[in-house]
């Protein structure tokens, strides 16, 4: 099964050794995605709504580059630094998944830099939903 690295046009070089996404057998695996600004610093420090929107736009870009849509997302892995961010994250999340909702889980944990409050990784099945 061949694997294709998915890097949307204009994507910044990741600060760690990973690809924004990979496509294999019609399945897109989107790496854990954080809200970085153009200089690879934390965008919108502490703002769960703004970070969630940027994260989901980045995920959408990866999935669309692979030939899919957000309707193809079947699973989301959500990481929050504090449960206080749960409601603001869900407010934005619902905008991106208005119909049938993907499976997901959400856990509280530390993230790689202070100021990040939301990280999401996704799986999408292109053309199979």
UniProtKB/Swiss-Prot annotation:
- Cite a single Pfam family from the UniProt record: Ribonuc_L-PSP
Entry keyword annotation includes Hydrolase? yes
The reaction(s) annotated as catalysed by this protein in its Swiss-Prot or TrEMBL entry are: (Z)-3-aminoacrylate + H2O + H(+) = 3-oxopropanoate + NH4(+)
Q: Which GO terms describe its molecular function?
A: deaminase activity
**The UniProt record lists the keyword Hydrolase:** yes
Keywords on this record?
Hydrolase
Q: Name one GO biological process term.
A: nitrogen utilization
Q: What class of enzyme is it?
A: hydrolase
The GO cellular component terms are: cytosol
Which EC number applies?
3.5.-.-
Give the function comment from the record.
Answer: Involved in pyrimidine catabolism. Catalyzes the deamination of 3-aminoacrylate to malonic semialdehyde, a reaction that can also occur spontaneously. RutC may facilitate the reaction and modulate the metabolic fitness, rather than catalyzing essential functions.
Similarity annotation: Belongs to the RutC family.
HAMAP family, A to Z: RutC
According to UniProt, the name of this protein is 3-aminoacrylate deaminase RutC
Q: Give the species.
A: Caulobacter vibrioides (strain NA1000 / CB15N) (Caulobacter crescentus)
Q: What phylogenetic lineage does the species belong to?
A: Bacteria, Pseudomonadati, Pseudomonadota, Alphaproteobacteria, Caulobacterales
Q: Which gene encodes it?
A: rutC
């Amino acid at each position: 099964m061949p694997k294709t690295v998915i890097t949307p046009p204009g994507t910044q070089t990741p600060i760690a050794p990973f690809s924004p996404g990979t496509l294999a057998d019609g399945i897109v695996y989107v790496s854990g995605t954080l809200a970085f600004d153009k200089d690879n610093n934390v965008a919108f420090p502490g703002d769960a709504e703004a970070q969630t929107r940027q994260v989901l736009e980045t995920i959408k870009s990866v999935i669309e580059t692979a030939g899919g849509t957000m309707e193809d997302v079947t699973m989301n892995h959500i990481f929050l630094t504090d449960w206080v961010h749960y409601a603001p994250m869900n407010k934005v999340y619902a905008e991106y998944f208005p119909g049938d909702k993907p499976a997901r889980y959400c856990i509280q944990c530390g993230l790689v830099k202070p100021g990040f409050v939301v990280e999401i990784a996704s799986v999408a099945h292109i053309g199979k939903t």
